[in-house]
Regions:
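Beta-strand signatures of extracellular beta-sandwich domains
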Residues: 74-76
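Short amphipathic, basic-aromatic surface patches that mediate peripheral association
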Residues: 54-65
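Short coil-to-beta strand junction motifs in C2/discoidin
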Residues: 65-72
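Short, compositionally biased P/S/T/A/G/V-rich stretches that sit at domain boundaries
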Residues: 18-44
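Solvent-exposed, conformationally flexible loop/turn segments
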Residues: 47-51
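Active-site mouth of glycoside hydrolases
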Residues: 72, 133-135, 151-309
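Extended acidic/polar, glycine-enriched regions
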Residues: 82-84, 89-166, 185
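Extracellular beta-strand ligand-recognition surfaces/modules
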Residues: 1-14
């Protein structure tokens, strides 16, 4: 069943080249999705394992904002015991809607589409410096100090330090995973919400889902390096829902089905679409394909690496 409706404002899911002076400005911090409230001394206090998201405007010159070779945003983070770099990303906002029990995602005007999304995983002082690199130009901005206080969240799920055959959370609590596959993100009814809720109600604490071309895969446009923002919005929702329900996610990044039959003919890595591969096997060996795939991995880490589950 098709449904047509009015569109609010201009929708630009395609890539729009940018031609402005280099700038990095209007930075806002959100903590667990809410605007941060600095203390009187300017310090922002958060709890351990809170999700921090910096939203900002970035200007410069590029053809594709998803290509870090053209423009890249990075946060240099100094916590109580270490210093590390964390990648940023470009995104477009979507709003989840339902029409006759069918889920749709409507594009929305996106204020401050450049983001840094990370988790405060260590108590103590935390400082972030943002850096944007655009060709030979670069700009840095130091951000207000953050104080991370200990909380009661379990933290990231990792291999157990006692027995690597099992899992444990950062707080030392063990975890035995019980769950099943959800290979396709279903947009009929309120799935995956209903399915995930039933799983949690019955004691399941993990699931596996695919980033395939007909589900949550983001790199499936007319050429490599163009990321489907509607699929990314669905994955944002999926990760938030599973985190709320205490369900850990095995995110399957690819499927062989996208490299056979009609799907290979549609695959953006196929040479007929400006890709790098004459045949599916080339995807594993061509240096250009490997380089492009690393860019996608960078985007995945930047957008969803914050998730403790």
């Amino acid at each position: 069943r098709l449904r047509f409706g009015e569109r609010d404002g201009d929708y630009q899911d395609h890539i729009v080249p940018k031609r402005t002076p280099l700038r990095l400005q209007d930075v806002d911090l959100y903590v667990n999705g809410n605007p941060a409230a600095p203390a009187a001394d300017g310090t922002i206090r958060v709890r351990q394992y809170d999700t921090l998201e910096y939203r900002m405007e970035v200007g410069g010159k590029w053809e594709n904002p998803y290509d870090p070779d053209q423009v890249s945003l990075t946060a240099n983070v100094t916590s109580a015991s270490r210093t590390y770099s964390y990648p940023g990303f470009y995104m477009l906002d979507f709003q989840r809607q339902f029409h006759d029990s069918v889920e749709t995602w409507a594009p929305q005007p996106t204020a401050k589409p450049w983001r840094i999304r990370l988790t405060a995983d260590e108590p103590g002082p935390m400082r972030c410096q943002l850096r944007v690199v655009n060709g030979r130009k670069r700009k840095t901005v130091a951000l207000p100090r953050i104080e991370v206080v200990a909380g009661n969240k379990r933290g990231f799920l990792r291999s157990s330090q006692t027995d690597p055959h099992y899992f444990q959370y950062d707080n030392g609590e063990g975890c035995f995973l019980i769950g099943h596959n959800l290979p396709i993100y279903n947009n009929i009814g309120k799935a995956p919400d209903t399915i995930l809720q039933r799983m949690a109600d019955n004691g399941e604490n993990c699931c596996r889902i695919w980033m395939s071309s007909d589900s949550l895969g983001i790199e499936w446009e007319d050429r490599p390096g163009r990321y489907r923002q509607e699929s990314a919005a669905r994955l944002d929702h999926f990760m938030a829902t599973t985190e709320r329900l205490g369900i850990n996610v095995m995110l399957c990044l690819d499927t062989h089905q996208d490299f056979v039959g009609q799907r290979w003919l549609d695959n953006p890595y196929n040479k007929v679409h400006g890709g790098f591969c004459k045949k599916p096997q080339d995807w594993f060996t061509r240096k250009a394909a490997q380089k492009q795939y690393r860019k996608r991995l960078r985007y995945l880490v930047a957008r969803w690496g914050y998730a403790t589950n």
